[in-house]
UniProtKB/Swiss-Prot annotation:
Induction section of the entry: By anaerobiosis.
Name this protein carries in UniProt: Uncharacterized protein in sor 3'region
Length: 77
């Protein structure tokens, strides 16, 4: 998406033509990606819940909890 007459969002002499409208899809892709990271579908026993997560996931802790849960259910790892 290149604009032949310069950047429509900024007048001539403002930002260069390689500016924000061409970077905008990357920004949207980024926001979608972060949304996917923040709301991960977690399924146990066929039930799916969307759990919003606002902090980095400690996978070691999650795996430990999952193993404890499965051991409690009588699952042999």
């Amino acid at each position: 998406m290149s604009y032949p007459y310069g950047n429509p969002y900024y007048p001539q002499g403002g930002y260069p033509t390689q500016g924000y409208p061409q970077g905008n899809p990357y920004y949207q892709q980024n926001s979608n990606f972060s949304f996917i990271m923040c709301a991960q579908p977690i399924g146990l026993g066929g039930k799916q819940m969307m759990i919003p997560i606002n902090h980095p996931i400690d996978l070691q802790y999650v795996a430990q909890q999952a193993v404890m849960y499965l051991m409690g259910q009588g699952f042999q790892a």
